[in-house]
């Protein structure tokens, strides 16, 4: 008799074996739905790569809690460029009963549906089939037709087919028809049909167990004038091979070919493939794309497309030989010698005026004196007593010990003052006050005289010459530049007194004021170029006694020195230029009228669709880039020189470079349909096809617009583009003619202010239309003349549903 414990163990083992026998073993195969996202909540979400996400789904594990069982029927995956922020969303079978109403297009996601197939074949890729809804292979390309109970049997038969290579199937969900073919959308894309029959549902599945990278073999050959790339395909291929950034000008479209090639010329030979060839070090790198996803337009790059890099050395680049090395060393020595000579010359110029005496009179009108700025400090063991005797008047001042903090104020904006004095028969005497510094600490009186420490440099010259020498301020050496002017612009302003504030920063030293009188016996014209920086310094001093005997005007010694120069009462002509004139301020013409000023936004850039400004469109939509000057000048004076489109925050590195759509006033064939620039009402426009990048829907258009101020811009002769109006660059008729505008301005001259011109220009001679044309068009064109870089952003979505979602929520 058996032991009861043994019977119990045998019973448990039998039940365990029976339960394992009844559990069906799933051989997981995934069907990919590209660019699809399910818009309902998943049962679990985790940050896993696609391989980890599919592994958890195949094993029936929870991706969040490894080891915990979770039934999985499909996953929605979003790949992240950084390799860490992936998104894996898991769905169970009961959630997939009816997914047709919950599928939305999203380039960021891919949906993978898991099928348990009885096939024993193993696929090396991440998925076995690619799904296309409501499509099927043409009956002429179908080799085998059977009836199956479900989709799983049809997929399994395609994987296990031995008589031919099953590249695709078309499964009829209504009658169970399984149509197998040896062609695919790569070999015969034109054979794929769209199902428009509402009586049955049929879908297309392409077999991806054939590795695409093994199906194509790339080779390239480096030539003197370009790079030749050849491709061999295991199966007949139909598609396109093209340069990454030059689809429209640099491509070949083979039709059911097994061997094909394309020649990519260098930039020095042709510009057709110039954007796809980059220089990296001593090599030229060509980036080639082979379209394998079957998605049109073919220039829309997807991760399924194959990319190939061909590298060739730059012709003419050789290693340095001894002769080249010797010449390079000789050139370096020459450069060093020139630098040393320049430094010696600059040092000599900076020391030129140290030992020269101060010249008080100028006997010749062409004498030019340049003073070198030096700060001189003398330290002795004597008290500081400064005496300047001109008359018998003596003033004694005792300064108490102040205790204040140093305060320094610096004005960075340069001020240039030019003073022109008319000829006077009498000699002119101009007193000038300069400041020097002396430091002392003993008792015997002594007088110390130094050169002026004025931080300004001046040049006095004759009025008969038209050449002005302007000496700029520099801390190490004097630098002179020569300018010639024929017609200087002047403005008459009566300036009886000119006051200039200067200061010298001196640590713990008193100041001494020296009055110097300069007498010019002959009539002269003085032009002074001054660059001033206002600085105020307050220092702490000991009680000192300063004795000064001067004539009026007198200057009291203090830390801050103010110098006042009184000019003769004779009429003067002064031209003052302070910085650059403001662009928004109107200038004054010779006749007193106000000229049109340059506005803050000279060219207005808008994007239109069907005559309405837009900020979001569907990819492939025809839009118009409109450029309108601020003033209503004729469109012949507006020219679009160049345009490019670039993504906003793309995820892939190859998407960062902008694509040109207009170059030198003509289409650049960068991407999509681009028409030549045309004239529009008061401006220009460019009709293009909205382009979208793979990882971002936000793009930016940047264009260079030229306003020709004096004559109509030269016309550009561009080749005709299919899909564009051949009669481009024509001018539209204005709704309001120039005659109507002229009559309105003559009736009410105050309306002229709306054009940025003076109403007095029409009040003087309102009967002449020539005056109107010259004032309105010429002044406004001159005000707007130049090149302007304008930018505009646009959101490009994939479908009308996404566009409605964006309009409703504001999110992409």
UniProtKB/Swiss-Prot annotation:
Protein's GO biological process: anatomical structure morphogenesis; cuticle pattern formation; embryonic ectodermal digestive tract morphogenesis; epithelial cell development; negative regulation of tube lumen cavitation; positive regulation of epithelial tube formation; positive regulation of multicellular organism growth; positive regulation of nematode larval development
Null allele phenotype: Lethal at the larval stage of development. Defects in the development of the excretory system during embryogenesis and the early stages of larval development. Dilated lumens of both the excretory canal cell and excretory duct which become apparent between the early and mid 3-fold stages of embryogenesis and increases in severity as development progresses. Lumen dialation may be as a result of fluid accumulation due to blockage of the lumen. At around the time of hatching, the autocellular junction, which usually seals the excretory pore tube, is absent.
Record domain ZP: where: 221-725
Residues in Apple domain copies: 26-116, 123-209
Keywords: Cell membrane, Cleavage on pair of basic residues, Developmental protein, Disulfide bond, Glycoprotein, Membrane, Secreted, Signal
Domain of life: Eukaryota
Stated name of the protein: Protein let-653
């Amino acid at each position: 008799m058996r032991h009861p414990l043994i019977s119990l163990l045998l019973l448990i083992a039998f039940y365990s074996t029976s339960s394992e026998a009844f559990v069906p073993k799933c051989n997981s195969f995934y069907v990919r739905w590209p660019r699809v996202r399910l818009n309902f909540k998943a049962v679990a979400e985790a940050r896993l790569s696609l391989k980890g996400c599919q592994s958890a789904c195949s094993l029936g594990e929870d991706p969040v809690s490894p080891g915990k069982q979770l039934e999985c029927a499909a996953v929605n995956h979003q790949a992240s460029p950084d390799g860490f922020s992936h998104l894996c969303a898991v769905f169970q079978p009961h959630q997939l009963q009816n997914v047709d109403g919950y599928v939305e297009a999203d380039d960021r996601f891919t949906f993978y549906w898991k099928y348990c197939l009885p096939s024993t074949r193993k696929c090396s890729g991440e998925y076995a089939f690619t799904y296309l809804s409501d499509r099927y292979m043409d009956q002429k390309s179908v080799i085998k037709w059977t009836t199956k109970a479900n989709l799983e049997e049809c997929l399994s038969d395609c994987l296990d087919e031995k008589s031919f290579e099953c590249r695709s199937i078309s499964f009829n969900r209504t009658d169970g028809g399984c149509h197998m073919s040896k062609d695919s959308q790569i070999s015969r894309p034109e054979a794929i049909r769209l199902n428009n029959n509402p009586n049955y549902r049929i879908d297309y599945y392409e077999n991806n167990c054939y590795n695409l990278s093994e199906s194509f073999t790339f080779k390239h050959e480096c030539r003197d004038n370009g790079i030749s790339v050849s491709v061999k395909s295991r199966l007949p291929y139909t598609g396109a091979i093209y340069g990454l950034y030059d689809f429209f000008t640099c491509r070949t479209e083979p039709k059911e070919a097994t061997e094909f090639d394309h020649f990519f010329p260098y930039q020095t030979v042709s510009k057709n493939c110039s954007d796809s060839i980059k220089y990296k070090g001593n090599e030229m790198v060509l980036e080639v794309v082979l379209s394998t996803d079957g998605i049109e337009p073919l220039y829309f790059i997807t991760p399924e497309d194959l990319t190939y890099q061909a590298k060739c050395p730059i012709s003419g680049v050789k290693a340095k030989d001894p002769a080249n090395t010797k010449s390079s060393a000789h050139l370096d020595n020459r450069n060093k010698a020139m630098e040393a000579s320049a430094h010696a010359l600059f040092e000599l110029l900076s020391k030129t005026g140290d030992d020269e005496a101060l010249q008080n009179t100028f006997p010749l009108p062409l004498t030019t004196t340049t003073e070198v700025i030096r700060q001189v400090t003398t330290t002795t063991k004597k008290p500081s007593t400064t005496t300047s005797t001109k008359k018998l008047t003596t003033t004694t001042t005792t300064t108490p010990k102040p205790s204040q903090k140093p305060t320094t104020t610096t004005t960075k904006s340069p001020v240039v003052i030019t003073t022109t004095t008319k000829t006077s028969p009498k000699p002119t005497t101009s007193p000038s006050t300069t400041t020097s510094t002396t430091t002392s600490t003993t008792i015997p009186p002594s007088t110390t005289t130094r050169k002026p420490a004025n931080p300004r440099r001046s040049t006095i010259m004759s009025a008969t010459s038209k050449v002005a020498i302007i000496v700029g301020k520099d801390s190490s050496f004097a630098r002179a530049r020569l300018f010639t002017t024929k017609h200087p612009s002047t403005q008459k302003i009566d300036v009886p007194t000119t006051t200039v504030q200067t200061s010298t920063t001196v640590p713990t030293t008193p100041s001494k004021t020296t009055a110097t009188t300069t007498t010019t016996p002959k009539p002269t014209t003085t032009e002074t170029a001054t660059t001033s920086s206002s600085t105020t310094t307050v220092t702490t001093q000991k009680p000192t006694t300063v004795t000064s005997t001067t004539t009026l005007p007198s200057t009291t010694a203090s830390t801050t020195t103010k110098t006042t120069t009184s000019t003769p009462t004779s009429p003067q002509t002064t031209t003052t230029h302070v910085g650059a004139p403001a662009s928004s301020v109107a200038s004054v013409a010779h006749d007193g009228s106000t000229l049109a000023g340059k506005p803050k936004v000279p060219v207005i850039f808008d994007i239109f669709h069907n005559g309405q400004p837009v900020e979001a469109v569907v990819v492939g939509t025809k839009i118009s880039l409109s450029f309108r000057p601020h003033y209503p000048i004729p469109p012949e004076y507006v020219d679009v020189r160049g345009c490019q489109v670039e993504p906003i925050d793309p995820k892939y590195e190859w998407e960062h470079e902008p694509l040109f759509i207009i170059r030198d006033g003509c289409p650049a064939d960068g991407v999509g349909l681009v028409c030549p620039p045309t004239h529009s009402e008061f401006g220009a426009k460019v009709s293009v096809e909205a382009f979208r990048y793979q990882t971002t829907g936000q793009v930016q258009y940047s264009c260079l617009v030229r306003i020709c101020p004096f004559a109509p811009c030269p016309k550009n002769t561009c080749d005709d583009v299919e899909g564009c109006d051949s009669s481009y660059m024509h001018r539209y008729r204005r709704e309001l003619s120039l005659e109507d505008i002229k009559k309105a301005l003559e009736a009410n001259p105050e309306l002229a202010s709306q054009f940025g011109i003076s109403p007095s220009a029409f009040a003087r001679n309102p009967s002449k239309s020539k005056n109107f044309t010259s004032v309105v068009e010429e002044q406004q064109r001159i005000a707007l003349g130049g090149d302007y870089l304008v930018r505009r952003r646009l959101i490009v979505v994939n479908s009308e549903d996404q566009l409605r979602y964006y309009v409703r929520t504001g999110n992409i």
